[in-house]
Regions:
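Active-site region of glycoside hydrolase catalytic domains
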Residues: 1-293
Protein backbone atom coordinates (compact mmCIF):
# COMPACT_ATOMS: atom_id res chain seq x y z
CA UNK A 1 0.00 0.00 0.00
CA UNK A 2 2.76 2.47 0.95
CA UNK A 3 6.25 2.31 -0.54
CA UNK A 4 9.15 3.08 1.79
CA UNK A 5 7.27 4.45 4.79
CA UNK A 6 8.33 6.96 6.01
CA UNK A 7 11.16 8.78 4.20
CA UNK A 8 10.24 12.24 5.62
CA UNK A 9 11.02 13.57 2.14
CA UNK A 10 7.76 15.54 2.17
CA UNK A 11 8.52 17.42 5.38
CA UNK A 12 9.83 20.95 4.71
CA UNK A 13 12.18 21.83 7.61
CA UNK A 14 11.59 25.58 7.31
CA UNK A 15 7.90 25.06 8.06
CA UNK A 16 8.39 22.94 11.17
CA UNK A 17 10.00 24.08 14.45
CA UNK A 18 13.21 22.14 15.04
CA UNK A 19 11.99 20.76 18.35
CA UNK A 20 8.83 19.43 16.64
CA UNK A 21 10.49 17.81 13.62
CA UNK A 22 10.53 14.27 15.00
CA UNK A 23 6.95 14.57 16.20
CA UNK A 24 5.86 15.88 12.80
CA UNK A 25 7.52 12.94 11.07
CA UNK A 26 5.77 10.39 13.28
CA UNK A 27 2.46 12.21 12.83
CA UNK A 28 2.84 11.99 9.05
CA UNK A 29 3.73 8.31 9.38
CA UNK A 30 0.60 7.70 11.44
CA UNK A 31 -1.51 9.15 8.65
CA UNK A 32 0.21 6.76 6.21
CA UNK A 33 -0.44 3.76 8.43
CA UNK A 34 -4.12 4.62 8.87
CA UNK A 35 -4.54 5.27 5.15
CA UNK A 36 -2.93 1.92 4.39
CA UNK A 37 -5.30 0.10 6.73
CA UNK A 38 -8.29 1.78 5.09
CA UNK A 39 -7.09 0.66 1.66
CA UNK A 40 -6.55 -2.93 2.83
CA UNK A 41 -10.02 -3.09 4.39
CA UNK A 42 -11.71 -1.61 1.32
CA UNK A 43 -9.86 -3.93 -1.05
CA UNK A 44 -10.84 -7.00 0.96
CA UNK A 45 -14.48 -5.87 0.87
CA UNK A 46 -14.53 -4.96 -2.82
CA UNK A 47 -12.53 -8.00 -3.99
CA UNK A 48 -13.16 -10.96 -1.66
CA UNK A 49 -10.08 -13.14 -1.38
CA UNK A 50 -7.72 -10.41 -2.55
CA UNK A 51 -4.27 -10.13 -1.00
CA UNK A 52 -2.82 -6.76 -0.01
CA UNK A 53 0.65 -6.21 1.39
CA UNK A 54 2.91 -3.59 2.88
CA UNK A 55 6.42 -2.56 1.87
CA UNK A 56 9.30 -2.15 4.30
CA UNK A 57 12.67 -0.53 3.72
CA UNK A 58 14.67 -3.39 5.26
CA UNK A 59 17.78 -2.09 6.96
CA UNK A 60 19.18 -4.95 8.99
CA UNK A 61 21.76 -3.75 11.51
CA UNK A 62 24.41 -5.89 13.21
CA UNK A 63 26.23 -4.93 16.40
CA UNK A 64 29.73 -3.66 15.60
CA UNK A 65 31.02 -5.57 18.64
CA UNK A 66 29.54 -7.92 21.21
CA UNK A 67 29.75 -5.20 23.88
CA UNK A 68 26.34 -4.96 25.62
CA UNK A 69 26.01 -1.24 24.83
CA UNK A 70 26.54 -1.93 21.13
CA UNK A 71 23.99 -4.74 21.29
CA UNK A 72 21.40 -2.47 22.94
CA UNK A 73 21.97 0.27 20.36
CA UNK A 74 21.60 -2.32 17.60
CA UNK A 75 18.40 -3.69 19.09
CA UNK A 76 16.93 -0.17 19.15
CA UNK A 77 17.84 0.37 15.49
CA UNK A 78 16.22 -2.88 14.38
CA UNK A 79 13.07 -2.31 16.45
CA UNK A 80 12.69 1.13 14.88
CA UNK A 81 13.12 -0.31 11.38
CA UNK A 82 10.57 -3.07 11.93
CA UNK A 83 7.87 -1.11 13.71
CA UNK A 84 6.31 0.11 10.45
CA UNK A 85 5.59 -3.46 9.42
CA UNK A 86 4.57 -4.29 13.00
CA UNK A 87 1.63 -1.89 12.68
CA UNK A 88 0.76 -3.10 9.17
CA UNK A 89 0.74 -6.76 10.23
CA UNK A 90 -0.62 -6.61 13.78
CA UNK A 91 -2.89 -3.60 13.46
CA UNK A 92 -1.53 -1.81 16.50
CA UNK A 93 1.50 0.11 17.69
CA UNK A 94 4.11 -1.89 19.63
CA UNK A 95 4.16 -0.95 23.30
CA UNK A 96 7.90 -0.26 23.04
CA UNK A 97 7.25 2.41 20.41
CA UNK A 98 4.49 4.04 22.46
CA UNK A 99 6.80 4.17 25.47
CA UNK A 100 9.50 5.71 23.26
CA UNK A 101 7.02 8.43 22.30
CA UNK A 102 6.45 9.13 26.00
CA UNK A 103 10.16 9.31 26.81
CA UNK A 104 10.87 11.71 23.96
CA UNK A 105 7.82 13.87 24.51
CA UNK A 106 6.34 12.94 21.13
CA UNK A 107 2.58 13.42 20.86
CA UNK A 108 1.00 11.72 17.87
CA UNK A 109 -2.61 12.75 17.44
CA UNK A 110 -4.73 9.64 16.96
CA UNK A 111 -8.45 9.85 16.31
CA UNK A 112 -10.73 7.66 18.46
CA UNK A 113 -11.52 5.43 15.48
CA UNK A 114 -7.89 4.98 14.39
CA UNK A 115 -7.27 1.95 16.61
CA UNK A 116 -10.21 0.06 15.10
CA UNK A 117 -9.17 1.12 11.59
CA UNK A 118 -5.64 -0.22 12.05
CA UNK A 119 -6.92 -3.51 13.45
CA UNK A 120 -9.39 -3.96 10.58
CA UNK A 121 -6.78 -3.33 7.90
CA UNK A 122 -3.98 -5.82 8.56
CA UNK A 123 -1.96 -6.85 5.51
CA UNK A 124 -1.79 -10.32 4.00
CA UNK A 125 1.89 -10.34 3.06
CA UNK A 126 5.06 -8.34 3.69
CA UNK A 127 7.31 -7.01 0.95
CA UNK A 128 10.62 -5.25 1.38
CA UNK A 129 13.52 -3.60 -0.34
CA UNK A 130 17.00 -4.91 0.40
CA UNK A 131 20.25 -3.31 -0.67
CA UNK A 132 22.69 -3.50 2.22
CA UNK A 133 23.23 -4.02 5.92
CA UNK A 134 25.08 -1.87 8.39
CA UNK A 135 26.42 -2.07 11.91
CA UNK A 136 25.84 0.02 15.02
CA UNK A 137 28.22 1.17 17.73
CA UNK A 138 28.10 3.61 20.62
CA UNK A 139 31.69 4.59 19.80
CA UNK A 140 31.49 8.15 18.37
CA UNK A 141 34.74 7.57 16.49
CA UNK A 142 33.56 4.44 14.68
CA UNK A 143 33.97 4.71 10.90
CA UNK A 144 30.72 5.49 9.13
CA UNK A 145 29.58 4.29 5.73
CA UNK A 146 29.83 7.10 3.15
CA UNK A 147 27.24 8.28 0.71
CA UNK A 148 24.16 6.53 2.06
CA UNK A 149 20.71 7.99 2.57
CA UNK A 150 20.78 6.19 5.93
CA UNK A 151 24.09 6.24 7.76
CA UNK A 152 25.53 3.36 9.74
CA UNK A 153 28.83 2.11 11.04
CA UNK A 154 31.04 0.41 8.47
CA UNK A 155 31.31 -3.38 8.53
CA UNK A 156 34.97 -4.36 8.02
CA UNK A 157 33.97 -7.81 6.77
CA UNK A 158 31.98 -6.62 3.75
CA UNK A 159 32.93 -5.08 0.39
CA UNK A 160 31.30 -1.84 -0.71
CA UNK A 161 30.00 -0.35 -3.95
CA UNK A 162 31.53 2.81 -5.38
CA UNK A 163 28.95 4.72 -3.35
CA UNK A 164 29.70 3.03 -0.05
CA UNK A 165 26.73 0.67 0.09
CA UNK A 166 28.00 -2.52 1.68
CA UNK A 167 27.31 -5.74 -0.21
CA UNK A 168 25.88 -8.47 2.02
CA UNK A 169 24.10 -11.38 0.26
CA UNK A 170 23.93 -13.42 3.46
CA UNK A 171 22.26 -10.44 5.08
CA UNK A 172 19.33 -10.97 2.72
CA UNK A 173 18.88 -14.54 3.96
CA UNK A 174 19.18 -13.29 7.55
CA UNK A 175 16.59 -10.57 6.89
CA UNK A 176 14.08 -12.88 5.22
CA UNK A 177 14.28 -15.42 8.03
CA UNK A 178 13.88 -12.62 10.57
CA UNK A 179 10.82 -11.19 8.81
CA UNK A 180 9.14 -14.54 8.30
CA UNK A 181 9.76 -15.67 11.86
CA UNK A 182 8.41 -12.37 13.20
CA UNK A 183 5.29 -12.02 11.04
CA UNK A 184 4.41 -15.53 9.74
CA UNK A 185 3.33 -13.91 6.48
CA UNK A 186 4.43 -14.62 2.89
CA UNK A 187 7.26 -12.36 1.76
CA UNK A 188 8.30 -10.58 -1.42
CA UNK A 189 11.56 -8.82 -2.20
CA UNK A 190 10.43 -5.93 -4.39
CA UNK A 191 13.70 -3.99 -4.63
CA UNK A 192 17.22 -5.42 -4.76
CA UNK A 193 20.19 -4.22 -6.75
CA UNK A 194 23.48 -2.35 -6.84
CA UNK A 195 24.43 1.00 -8.29
CA UNK A 196 27.61 0.81 -10.38
CA UNK A 197 29.53 2.66 -13.07
CA UNK A 198 29.18 0.94 -16.44
CA UNK A 199 31.51 1.32 -19.44
CA UNK A 200 30.29 1.14 -23.03
CA UNK A 201 32.91 -0.62 -25.17
CA UNK A 202 33.82 0.49 -28.70
CA UNK A 203 31.55 -2.19 -30.16
CA UNK A 204 28.64 -1.04 -27.99
CA UNK A 205 28.79 -3.97 -25.57
CA UNK A 206 28.56 -3.46 -21.81
CA UNK A 207 30.30 -6.02 -19.63
CA UNK A 208 29.02 -5.92 -16.04
CA UNK A 209 30.18 -9.10 -14.26
CA UNK A 210 29.98 -7.26 -10.92
CA UNK A 211 26.22 -6.90 -11.35
CA UNK A 212 25.78 -10.53 -12.35
CA UNK A 213 27.77 -11.64 -9.30
CA UNK A 214 25.75 -9.38 -7.00
CA UNK A 215 22.46 -10.85 -8.15
CA UNK A 216 23.81 -14.41 -8.31
CA UNK A 217 24.82 -14.30 -4.67
CA UNK A 218 21.65 -12.58 -3.46
CA UNK A 219 19.29 -14.90 -5.34
CA UNK A 220 21.26 -17.90 -4.09
CA UNK A 221 20.88 -16.74 -0.48
CA UNK A 222 17.17 -16.14 -1.03
CA UNK A 223 16.92 -19.73 -2.23
CA UNK A 224 18.58 -20.91 0.97
CA UNK A 225 16.04 -18.94 3.01
CA UNK A 226 13.26 -20.70 1.10
CA UNK A 227 14.89 -24.06 1.82
CA UNK A 228 14.89 -23.16 5.51
CA UNK A 229 11.14 -22.58 5.44
CA UNK A 230 10.56 -18.98 4.37
CA UNK A 231 7.48 -18.59 2.15
CA UNK A 232 8.47 -16.34 -0.76
CA UNK A 233 5.86 -15.03 -3.19
CA UNK A 234 8.18 -13.16 -5.50
CA UNK A 235 11.34 -11.23 -6.25
CA UNK A 236 11.91 -8.14 -8.39
CA UNK A 237 15.07 -6.15 -8.95
CA UNK A 238 15.87 -2.46 -8.81
CA UNK A 239 15.86 -1.78 -11.57
CA UNK A 240 15.41 -3.45 -14.97
CA UNK A 241 16.53 -0.29 -16.76
CA UNK A 242 18.96 2.51 -15.88
CA UNK A 243 17.28 5.44 -14.16
CA UNK A 244 18.24 8.43 -12.06
CA UNK A 245 19.28 7.29 -8.59
CA UNK A 246 16.94 8.70 -5.95
CA UNK A 247 19.68 8.80 -3.32
CA UNK A 248 22.26 10.77 -5.34
CA UNK A 249 20.34 12.22 -8.34
CA UNK A 250 22.87 10.58 -10.65
CA UNK A 251 22.37 8.69 -13.88
CA UNK A 252 25.94 7.40 -13.67
CA UNK A 253 24.92 5.34 -10.65
CA UNK A 254 23.44 2.64 -12.83
CA UNK A 255 21.18 -0.18 -11.65
CA UNK A 256 19.66 -1.66 -14.79
CA UNK A 257 20.15 -4.66 -17.02
CA UNK A 258 19.47 -2.21 -19.85
CA UNK A 259 21.81 0.74 -20.43
CA UNK A 260 20.30 4.16 -21.17
CA UNK A 261 22.42 6.71 -23.03
CA UNK A 262 22.12 9.68 -20.69
CA UNK A 263 24.64 11.37 -18.42
CA UNK A 264 24.23 13.12 -15.08
CA UNK A 265 23.44 16.43 -16.81
CA UNK A 266 20.65 14.93 -18.90
CA UNK A 267 22.67 14.78 -22.11
CA UNK A 268 22.37 11.77 -24.41
CA UNK A 269 20.21 10.07 -27.00
CA UNK A 270 18.29 7.91 -24.49
CA UNK A 271 19.13 4.93 -26.71
CA UNK A 272 18.88 1.61 -24.87
CA UNK A 273 21.39 -1.24 -24.96
CA UNK A 274 21.39 -4.68 -23.37
CA UNK A 275 24.18 -5.30 -20.87
CA UNK A 276 25.69 -8.75 -20.31
CA UNK A 277 23.57 -8.97 -17.17
CA UNK A 278 20.43 -8.71 -19.32
CA UNK A 279 21.13 -12.04 -20.99
CA UNK A 280 22.14 -13.64 -17.70
CA UNK A 281 18.98 -12.51 -15.90
CA UNK A 282 16.86 -13.70 -18.82
CA UNK A 283 18.14 -17.21 -18.07
CA UNK A 284 17.41 -16.75 -14.37
CA UNK A 285 13.81 -15.79 -15.07
CA UNK A 286 13.31 -18.63 -17.56
CA UNK A 287 14.57 -21.16 -15.01
CA UNK A 288 12.68 -19.62 -12.06
CA UNK A 289 15.98 -18.96 -10.34
CA UNK A 290 17.46 -22.42 -10.86
CA UNK A 291 20.08 -21.43 -13.45
CA UNK A 292 22.45 -18.94 -11.82
CA UNK A 293 25.55 -19.82 -13.88
Amino acid sequence: TVRHPFTTAGIIPSRVPEDKMLETCYQALHHQLVASAMVVKDCHEIIPGSKVGCMLTKLTTYARTCAPDDELATQAKNLENLFYADVHVWGEYPRLILKMFERKGIHVEMLPEDAATLKAGCVDFVSCSYYMTMTESVDPNAERTPGNTVLGVKNPYLPSTDWGWQIDPKGLRYSLIELYDRYRKPLMVVENGMGAKDVVEADGSIHDPYRVEYFRQHISEMGKAIDEGVEMWGYTTWAPIDLISASTNQMSKRYGFIYVDQDDMGNGTLARSRKDSFYWYKKVIASNGEDLD
